[in-house]
């Protein structure tokens, strides 16, 4: 299927899979076209400020309210805030990539939580998951009432069949599924990647300040699907994440039956290669906030519930400057992943599909080999190519799960990358 998309970030879109399916001039007519059922999906409170208000009107074959009760569903490796099962540690942590199992595993059953913070009940905080899967979701869909999902593919392509349309994504792209939107994930082969579950306010573009009206992630490069529906009348399992637990119910039809919709709440994707990277053209390494793609704010201005930050291919031209990211202690907590290539502050040990966690005020920075190379490098203009690292950064301490602290992929010798620095020599 050759997919079509609508361009723009949080635009008010209008789309119909069947001509004439959208009502004209009102949202909820007495008799919608073709006998469709009108349903509003609200992503914010009715009275949220207009510039932040997000909702869409859906016109579907059957009302989504027509289903029976849900029952608990067990998935042991998926966890949610509050993360109290493991004692938080100030230690720097790094994980090798998790292997994709040979046994059949779909997207939902393949979710593994490494760390998180906050509490789903208070709609604050985030969780960092991995996904490992080798088969499509068959006659089952998923919805998350606890938060929106930012999905970062690392290995293999995925198709997201959602209530509001179909999105294809591959490594180098990201997909955001709003809270409550139902979807199915289809695969052509084994896949692996990362998920940021945002319990707080929805992701939005960061303010640009003195950068001006253009730069970083530009609105036009975000793609939202056009309406697409399926009329399937056979038992379909609907799995819902609610207050940290999973629940399952069986519907007598597919809930992906929205024929038309309009509004500004919808899933979308973004090609990270479109990011207009900013950097110094004189000296020093700017703060990594210049690499922010999306931000979900907290109640403190300028302090994020969670930021999504990337370290893409870019030119390094700073004069008389140590060019990689510097040594740092941060009031924010940083969970990092690597889609492809290498990260310029780590010469080894950080592999695509792996992850690291540097919590609040944990000392971190370049390893010995990277520091030596950058300190002695010829400072002619140099382009970092074939790389894509990223970071989920949050104002709260990110607590690793019990699984993350006990898995064999946790590197026992991570601290060793900072041993062997020679002492400075004073006159």
From Swiss-Prot:
It catalyses: homogentisate + O2 = 4-maleylacetoacetate + H(+). InterPro entries: HgmA_C, HgmA_N, Homogentis_dOase, Homogentis_dOase_bac, RmlC-like_jellyroll, RmlC_Cupin_sf. NCBIfam families: hmgA. PANTHER family: HOMOGENTISATE 1,2-DIOXYGENASE. Involved in the catabolism of homogentisate (2,5-dihydroxyphenylacetate or 2,5-OH-PhAc), a central intermediate in the degradation of phenylalanine and tyrosine. Catalyzes the oxidative ring cleavage of the aromatic ring of homogentisate to yield maleylacetoacetate. The keyword Repeat does not apply. Its cofactor is Fe cation. Keywords: Dioxygenase, Iron, Metal-binding, Oxidoreductase, Phenylalanine catabolism, Tyrosine catabolism. Coiled coil: none annotated. This is Homogentisate 1,2-dioxygenase. The keyword Metal-binding applies. GO terms for cellular component: cytoplasm.
């Amino acid at each position: 299927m050759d997919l079509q998309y609508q361009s723009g970030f949080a635009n008010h879109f209008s789309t119909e899979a069947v001509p004439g399916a959208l009502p004209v001039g009102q949202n909820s007519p007495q008799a919608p076209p073709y006998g469709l059922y009108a349903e509003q999906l609200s992503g914010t409170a009715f009275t949220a400020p207009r510039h932040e208000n997000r909702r869409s009107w859906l016109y579907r074959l059957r009302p989504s309210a027509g289903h029976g009760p849900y029952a608990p569903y067990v998935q042991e490796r998926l966890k949610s805030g509050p993360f109290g099962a493991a004692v938080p540690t100030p230690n720097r942590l790094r994980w090798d990539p998790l292997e994709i199992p040979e046994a059949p595993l779909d997207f939902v059953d393949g979710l593994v939580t490494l760390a998180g913070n906050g509490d789903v009940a208070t709609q604050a905080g985030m969780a960092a998951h991995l996904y490992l899967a080798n088969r499509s979701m068959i006659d089952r869909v998923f919805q998350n009432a606890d938060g929106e999902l930012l999905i970062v593919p690392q290995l293999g392509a995925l198709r997201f069949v959602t209530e509001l349309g179909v999105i294809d994504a591959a490594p180098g792209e990201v997909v955001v599924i709003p809270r409550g939107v139902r979807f199915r994930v289809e695969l052509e082969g084994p896949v692996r990647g990362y998920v940021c579950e945002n319990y707080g306010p929805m992701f939005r573009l960061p303010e640009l300040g003195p950068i001006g009206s253009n730069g970083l992630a530009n609105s036009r490069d975000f793609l939202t699907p056009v309406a697409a529906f399926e009329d399937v009348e056979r038992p379909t399992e609907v799995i819902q994440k609610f207050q940290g637990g999973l629940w399952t119910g069986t519907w007598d039809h597919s809930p992906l039956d929205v024929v038309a919709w309009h509004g500004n709440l919808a899933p979308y994707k973004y090609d990270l290669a479109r990011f207009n990277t900013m950097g110094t053209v004189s000296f020093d390494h700017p703060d990594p906030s210049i690499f922010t793609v999306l931000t979900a704010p907290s109640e403190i201005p300028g302090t994020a519930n969670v930021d999504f930050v990337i370290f893409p291919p870019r030119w390094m031209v700073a004069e008389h400057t140590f060019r990689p990211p510097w040594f740092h202690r941060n009031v924010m907590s940083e969970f990092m992943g690597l889609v492809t290539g290498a990260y310029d502050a780590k010469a080894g040990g950080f592999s695509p599909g792996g992850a690291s966690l540097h919590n609040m005020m944990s000392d971190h920075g370049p390893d010995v080999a990277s520091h030596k190379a950058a300190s002695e490098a010829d400072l002619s203009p140099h382009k970092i190519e074939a790389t894509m690292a990223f970071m989920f950064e949050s104002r709260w301490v990110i607590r690793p799960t019990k699984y993350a602290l006990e898995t064999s992929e946790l590197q026992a010798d991570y601290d060793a990358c900072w041993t062997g620095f020679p002492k400075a020599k004073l006159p």
